[in-house]
C-alpha cells in the first residue's frame, strides 16, 4: 500500500537540553560548572555550598535511588534525574519522579502545600431564604 501524501508521521521527541547541554553531559560536570548554568538565585545557593542535610539527602538518593525529604529548598541537580523523591508538603509525602525538565528548580515546587478548597452545598439556615425551606 502506498502512503497518502497528506498523512503525518508521528513526531519524535527531541532530546532535552539545558542551556545547550544534554543531561548526560551535565551529569559529568562538577557542581561549580553546573552552578554557572543555573539562574542567579540557584547559583548563589550552590556557591554557598550544600548544607549537611543536603549532602546527606544526596548520598541517600545515590545509594537507594529513592528518598524521603523535608528539604523543599533543595535544587534539582542533573544527578537526580530518573530518581524518585518523596517530598513533604506539610502533611504527607508526595511521590515525585525527577525528569530532565525539572533541573534548576526547587523540590518544593512539585509538592504543593495548599489544597484547593471544594465547598459542599449550603445547609439549612445558611442563607436568609433557606430559613423557610421545610425540613424533610
From Swiss-Prot:
GO terms classed as biological process: ribosomal small subunit assembly; translation
GO molecular function: rRNA binding; structural constituent of ribosome
Sorted UniProt keywords: Ribonucleoprotein, Ribosomal protein, RNA-binding, rRNA-binding
Keyword rRNA-binding: yes
PROSITE patterns: RIBOSOMAL_S19
GO CC annotation: cytosolic small ribosomal subunit
Ribonucleoprotein found in the keyword field: yes
InterPro entries reported for this sequence: Ribosomal_uS19 (IPR002222), Ribosomal_uS19_CS (IPR020934), Ribosomal_uS19_euk/arc (IPR005713), Ribosomal_uS19_SF (IPR023575)
Role summary: Protein S19 forms a complex with S13 that binds strongly to the 16S ribosomal RNA.
Stored HAMAP family: Ribosomal_uS19
Family: Belongs to the universal ribosomal protein uS19 family.
Cited PANTHER family: RIBOSOMAL PROTEIN S19P FAMILY MEMBER, SMALL RIBOSOMAL SUBUNIT PROTEIN US19
Name of the molecule in the record: Small ribosomal subunit protein uS19
Source organism (scientific name): Methanothrix thermoacetophila (strain DSM 6194 / JCM 14653 / NBRC 101360 / PT)
Amino acid at each position: 500500500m502506498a502512503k497518502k501524501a497528506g498523512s503525518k508521521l508521528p513526531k519524535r521527541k527531541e532530546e532535552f537540553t539545558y542551556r545547550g547541554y544534554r543531561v548526560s553531559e551535565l551529569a559529568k560536570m562538577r557542581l561549580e560548572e553546573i552552578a554557572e548554568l543555573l539562574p542567579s538565585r540557584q547559583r548563589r545557593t550552590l556557591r554557598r555550598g550544600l548544607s549537611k542535610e543536603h549532602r546527606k539527602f544526596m548520598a541517600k538518593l545515590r545509594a537507594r535511588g529513592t528518598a524521603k525529604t523535608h528539604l523543599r529548598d533543595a535544587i534539582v541537580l542533573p544527578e537526580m534525574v530518573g530518581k524518585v523523591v518523596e517530598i513533604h508538603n506539610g502533611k504527607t509525602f508526595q511521590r515525585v519522579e525527577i525528569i530532565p525538565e525539572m533541573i534548576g528548580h526547587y523540590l518544593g515546587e512539585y509538592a504543593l502545600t495548599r489544597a484547593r478548597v471544594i465547598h459542599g452545598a449550603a445547609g439549612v439556615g445558611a442563607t436568609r431564604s433557606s430559613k423557610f425551606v421545610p425540613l424533610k
